[in-house]
UniProtKB/Swiss-Prot annotation:
Name of the featured protein: Lipoate-protein ligase A
GO cellular component: cytosol
Enzyme nomenclature, EC number: 6.3.1.20
Other known facts: In the transfer reaction, the free carboxyl group of lipoic acid is attached via an amide linkage to the epsilon-amino group of a specific lysine residue of lipoyl domains of lipoate-dependent enzymes.
Binding site for ATP: 71, 76-79, 134
Family designation: Belongs to the LplA family.
GO BP term (any one): protein modification process
Residues that coordinate or bind (R)-lipoate: 134
Species name: Pectobacterium carotovorum subsp. carotovorum (strain PC1)
């Protein structure tokens, strides 16, 4: 019986694919070597310790229907589309070695006629006429008895869109999270015009088989053909939840300010695990009472635009004479935080 396992996802849902990855990683025998091949529709994928409000242009993402997905490994934020092929290698310890999986990917590229090399921050690079360009980035995760290496190969990604979503709006965030390093990148189709997702998957699969001298039958998985993984539905629900993707952000502070016809306002927030734990308001409004009430009411509220706007609107009952001001404030809050 082969010690290898090969899974190929037909789903483009990042939450589905990351849930598959997590379940396999937790449940695989430590004697097994796993290769999982997948790709995502338009998504910003952030590292386990990152702050999405700092890393991402969340307003633009929502307008364009771009998903946010938090992975369980460290590292920086990346933009995925169907021009990226994603790979995950998993193995038990002591056999797990990220240099082995890196070599398998390099062997796959070499078989396609492209010489690449490993570089610094977990990247694979190639020499081009315009200099060194990154074609692959990776992240890693280890537990006591196993580890995984996952990454992407840029095949035909829309590189112009990287900056659209990875460069945040200018917000006064003082964050304890990690800011991504932007890298100079290139698509493999610029160097290998005939390469596509299927071609690269076949090359990586063959390099995987060749390295270990074994083969196995691929398992094709999709939302209509769920993987046989205990607890998958629960993991899928968690992976797609706001609590995981946003609520796991590192603690941070945020300042919002604006001037309305009725006065200026500054709102200071301290946020932990996606929830406002402290809110302060400063204003030169002639009637600060509803704003002071808002600061109190926001404590314990999820740091979500719709929640904060609803909290503001709920105060209209207590302050009917300030209905217009509170409505204007609610609309501003919802717009500013997207």
């Amino acid at each position: 019986m082969s010690s290898l396992r090969l899974l190929i996802s037909d789903s483009y849902d990042p939450w589905f694919n990351l849930a598959v990855e997590e379940c396999i990683f937790r449940q695989m025998p430590t004697t097994q070597r796993v290769l999982f091949l997948w790709r995502n529709a338009e998504t910003v994928v952030i590292g386990r310790a990152q702050n999405p409000w700092k890393e991402c242009n969340t307003r633009r993402m929502e307008e364009d229907g771009i998903k946010l997905a938090r992975r369980s490994s460290g590292g920086g934020a990346v933009f995925h589309d169907l021009g990226n092929t994603c790979f995950t290698f998993m193995a038990g310890k002591p056999e797990y070695d990220k240099s082995v999986s890196t070599q398998i990917v390099l062997d796959a590229l070499s078989a396609l006629g492209l010489k690449a090399s490993a570089s610094g921050r977990n990247d694979l690079v190639v020499e081009t006429a315009d200099g060194v360009r990154k074609v692959s980035g990776s992240a890693y995760r280890e537990t006591k008895d196993r580890g995984f290496h996952h990454g992407t190969l840029l095949l035909n990604a829309d590189l112009n869109r990287l900056a659209d979503y990875l460069n945040p709006d200018i917000k006064k965030l003082q964050a304890k999270g990690i800011t991504s390093v932007r890298s100079r990148v290139a698509n493999l189709v610029e160097l290998l015009p005939s390469v596509d997702h299927q071609v690269i998957c076949q090359a990586v699969t063959q390099a995987f088989f060749d390295y270990f001298g074994e083969q196995c039958e691929p398992e094709i998985i999709s939302p209509s053909a769920y993987p046989d993984l205990p607890g998958f539905s629960e993991q899928f629900a968690r992976q797609s939840s706001w609590e995981w993707n946003f609520g796991q952000a590192p603690d941070f502070s945020h300042l919002l300010d604006n001037r309305f016809t009725w006065g200026g306002i500054e709102l200071h927030f301290d946020v932990e695990r996606g929830v406002i734990i402290r809110a302060q308001v400063y204003t030169d409004s002639l009637n600060p009472a509803p704003l002071e009430a808002l600061a109190c009411a926001l404590q314990g509220t999820a740091y979500r635009p719709e929640n904060m706007a609803a909290t503001c609107q709920a105060l209209i009952t207590a302050f009917p004479e300030q209905q217009n001001e509170l409505q204007e404030l609610a609309e501003w809050l919802e717009q500013s935080l997207r």
